Amino acid sequence: MFYTTEVNDHGLKYNPFKAIVAPRPIAWISTIDNEGRTNLAPYSFFNGMQDSPPIIGFGSGPSKVGIDEPKDSLSNIKATGNFCVSIVSEALKNQMNISSGHFPHSENEYEIAGLTQSKGVTVSAPFVTEAPVSLECKLHDIITLPGTSKWVIGLVTAVHIKDEFIINGKLDITKYRPIARLGYKDYATISQVYELDRPK
């Protein structure tokens, strides 16, 4: 099949784009506002951009379809200049899904999802205590994309890794089984890996 994205004339029941760009790691973004209220939400347009210095980025759309209003995560990052990213393991998939709901500013996603938060060391934002890996980030830039989304770029200033997932000097993702976003309502669990040597 062939279709143009300007018209989206694919003829399918659902737009296949998110299923094509998959699997995508999930950034569990934790922020805090100037009043000390925390926010937690998952974002699947997320990835590392470079490793020296470590830079990550994630895309944030409007809070609701048809409403051009930024999500709490983006508003808090603009206000404080920092945030944390926690990686979602298979064991935390249900809590992550709960935190994806639309809640009033006064409600705490950590409490709603039954999670605890740990205080950041280099940033004011907390991170998910139960997560296998968390990154503390300082805002580097926010880029306005075509349409209604923003691309948030963060400099990673500190890394938290639970010791039980470091095996023989390497982070073993098969031990904590991170989940990834696919298309539609689909997710995947990373449970099997293999190595390939680069050509010399």
For the regions a protein language model found, what residue spans apply to each?
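Basic, polyanion-binding surface patches
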Residues: M1-K200
